[in-house]
Swiss-Prot record:
NCBIfam families: mraY
Leftover remarks: Was identified as a high-confidence drug target.
UniProt signal peptide: none
Protein name: Phospho-N-acetylmuramoyl-pentapeptide-transferase
Membrane topology of the entry: Multi-pass membrane protein
Length: 359
């Protein structure tokens, strides 16, 4: 628990102190955000706001994670695990793709960065490497960071994927979550606040897995998860980094996370869901992200098949703006919905454990 608190504290500190430095630097360099011409009129005043704030988020996550492990050396904490490094590696790789995308947008002074093909190739490459590596690094108990079994709150032994299918499954998960968070990042503080709650829920889940790991506490309801405490530190550091960034990103935002941050954060969810064996449960925890990307898919499908749009604008947070909701109203209500779905997700997780132990 001490390591988790340290991870949060370090991540918040680094993120909240580094972000204003980036604001001044990016403002001086003219690294301003470009606004969609077809977006809500109220957003045009945001043109020129510094972007690429995801750099501070990634720095906070890395600092929180490494700081917690360094502190752990003083009180016999667990060392760095393969699971945590793989999740961080995935997030950093996707953040790199987003950074290039943001840089192109800034250099060309338009809201279009990497073309779809290049961006997709970057996401797929990151996902394939993750999918291959996550089935390696078997520990003394025979556990790998990931499992080829589909999982809800633990592995579903009756649904096992062949290695190639598992890698393809990882491509779908990584692409879906990174794009989902990217679509959600359209209002001041929406993605950062939502992500803080989702990863806070993951802190509870992975810490519970750590306390009830089959390796150290065998028995009914135990979890076969490699490095659960390591995953809790990743989740805690991510929550802390998002909170620190939110201090500057809350409406009216002084800086945006850009694709650097949104793609990286999507990678964190994807990585945590695979390594903690909660791929299906993650859909409940991150229901808002799922709803946002679903609204985009439905908008495209309905327009191509009927010539009409289901929403006034997608992602659907813009739809609510265009029907008269204030931006802050949309943000707060979406945060409330996320708090509910995260609470539901944790309740489902705990309920499954109670059922497993026969309580």
């Amino acid at each position: 628990m001490r390591q988790i608190l340290i991870a949060v504290a370090v991540a918040v500190t680094v993120s909240i102190l580094l972000t204003p430095v980036l604001i001044r630097l990016f403002t001086k360099q003219g690294f301003g955000h470009q606004i969609r011409e077809d977006g809500p009129p109220s957003h045009h005043t945001k043109r020129g706001t510094p972007s690429m704030g995801g750099v501070a988020i990634l720095a906070g996550i890395w600092a929180g994670y490494l700081g917690a492990h360094l502190a752990g050396l003083a009180f016999d904490g667990e060392g760095i695990g393969a699971s945590g490094l793989l999740v961080l590696g995935l997030a950093t790789a996707l953040g790199g793709v987003g950074f290039i995308d943001d840089l192109i947008k800034i250099r060309r002074s338009r809201n279009l960065g990497l073309n779809k093909t290049a961006k997709t190739v970057g996401q797929i490459t990151s996902a394939v490497l993750f999918g291959v590596l996550v089935l390696q690094f078997r520990n003394a108990a025979g556990l790998t960071p990931g499992s080829a079994d589909l999982s809800y709150v633990r592995e579903i032994a009756t649904v096992t994927l062949a290695p190639v299918l598992f890698v393809l499954f990882c491509v779908v998960i990584v692409s879906a979550w990174s794009n989902a968070v990217n679509f959600t990042d359209g209002l001041d503080g929406l993605a950062a606040g939502t992500m803080a709650m989702v990863t806070a829920a993951y802190v509870l889940i992975t810490f519970w897995q750590y306390r009830n790991a089959c390796v150290t506490a065998p028995g009914l309801g135990c979890y076969n998860v490699r490095d659960p405490l390591d995953l809790a530190l990743i989740a805690a550091a991510t929550a802390g980094a998002c909170i620190g960034f939110l201090w500057w990103n809350a409406a009216p935002a002084k800086i945006f996370m850009g694709d650097t941050g949104s793609l990286a954060l999507g990678g964190v969810i994807a990585g945590l869901s695979v390594t903690s064996r909660t791929e299906i449960l993650a859909v409940v925890l991150g229901a808002l992200f799922v709803a946002e990307i679903t609204s985009v898919v439905l908008q495209i499908l309905t327009f191509r098949t009927t010539g009409r749009r289901m929403f006034r604008m997608a992602p659907f947070h813009h739809h609510f703006e265009l029907v008269g909701w204030a931006e802050t109203t949309v943000i707060i209500r979406f945060w409330l919905l996320t708090a509910i779905t995260c609470g539901l997700g944790v309740a489902l997780f705990y309920g499954e454990w109670l059922a497993a132990v026969g309580a």
